[in-house]
Amino acid sequence: MEQAAGEPTRTCLTEDIPKAKRCTVIGGCGFLGQHMVEQLLARGYAVNVFDIRQGFDNPRVQFFLGDLCSQQDLYPALKGVSTVFHCASPPPFNNNKELFYRVNYIGTKNVIETCKEAGVQKLILTSSASVIFEGVDIKNGTEDLPYATKPIDYYTETKILQERAVLGAHDPEKNFLTTAIRPHGIFGPRDPQLVPILIEAAKKGKMKFMIGNGKNLVDFTFVENVVHGHILAAEHLSQDTALGGKAFHITNDEPIPFWTFLSRILTGLNYEAPKYHIPYWLAYYLALLVSLLVMVISPVIQLQPTFTPMRVALAGTFHYYSCEKAKKLMGYRPLVTMDDAVDKTVRSFHHLRKVM
């Protein structure tokens, strides 16, 4: 395939780095992607970024902008690299089914084919532990649990399709190796979702109640640990390892009560923690009633309820996952403890701190 017009010329520094240390981060301008770029550079990699728009500047990074579903746009960013990290996705709380399907599934199929066309050897996918979650308790869940037959949302539905496509493309005979990393509850500095949304809800007085008894354990995973898992997967993935065509949970390995975690963020930024309890069953059936009402009036009025049964399940059930497989096969250990991760995150959002 010929070089596309406008393709950046590689610098001498990049040319001095062996192909095994050249990589592309698809979605590299996003929350996880930026952290991944930073750690890869720190470890001596030459890094390309492919994204729909450029979100930051770094003279050591080559940026390629375009449509994930276009091989013509994507190919220049993958040419000459050994490894591709694919972490592009619409935000999980988006409710646009067509967008999720186009980016997470159609776009990923294009990533696979373009990787093969460009001679990429390794494709590391950012998947999600939610691909096995159906709204009921999961305690220390392992990777051999089946995919959810009733995914919690459009995001998860298309992440299942995406992960299946990537793992199914693993072909050691043709020197194309794939694996998928399944984080859960990613948080950290520059997070555009969890902390800002939480603080906005607190400002509106919506964080006074907790669903259930507050004891349900959940995995929240610090972004640096998620990146570490991706890089370990890439560095351990070879034709003679058991990583190929497999998925791996990556967590902080410190399950924490869901409401305790949120409370630590809130109080760290000078907001009150939830004080009152709503029984789980009551919250679930209220959400179910709201969903039914929305369905009934949908021919007349289109509404997007935020209080849904599955979101109640996310807040009120146990869902934490074993990362023993990643420990055994790639030597994974979290780099940052939960206490340090929460502290770093709170300090990074000082601009959201409530003035007392």
Swiss-Prot record:
N-acetylmethionine: modified positions: 1
One Gene Ontology cellular component annotation held by this UniProt entry: lipid droplet
Positions with a binding annotation for NAD(+): 159
Membrane topology (UniProt): Single-pass membrane protein
Subcellular compartments: Endoplasmic reticulum membrane; Lipid droplet
Protein EC: 1.1.1.170
Catalytic residues (UniProt): 155 (proton acceptor)
Motif Prevents secretion from ER: positions: 353-356
MF (Gene Ontology): 3-beta-hydroxysteroid dehydrogenase (NAD+)/C4-decarboxylase activity; oxidoreductase activity, acting on the CH-OH group of donors, NAD or NADP as acceptor
Top EC category: oxidoreductase
Disulfide feature: none
Segments crossing the lipid bilayer: 281-301
Domain of life: Eukaryota
Catalytic activity of the protein: a 3beta-hydroxysteroid-4alpha-carboxylate + NADP(+) = a 3-oxosteroid + CO2 + NADPH; a 3beta-hydroxysteroid-4alpha-carboxylate + NAD(+) = a 3-oxosteroid + CO2 + NADH; 4alpha-carboxyzymosterol + NADP(+) = zymosterone + CO2 + NADPH; 4alpha-carboxy-4beta-methyl-5alpha-cholest-8-en-3beta-ol + NADP(+) = 4alpha-methyl-5alpha-cholest-8-en-3-one + CO2 + NADPH
Pathway it works in: Steroid biosynthesis; zymosterol biosynthesis; zymosterol from lanosterol: step 4/6
Major location (coarse): endoplasmic reticulum
Family: Belongs to the 3-beta-HSD family.
Quaternary structure (record): Homodimer.
Protein name in UniProt: Sterol-4-alpha-carboxylate 3-dehydrogenase, decarboxylating
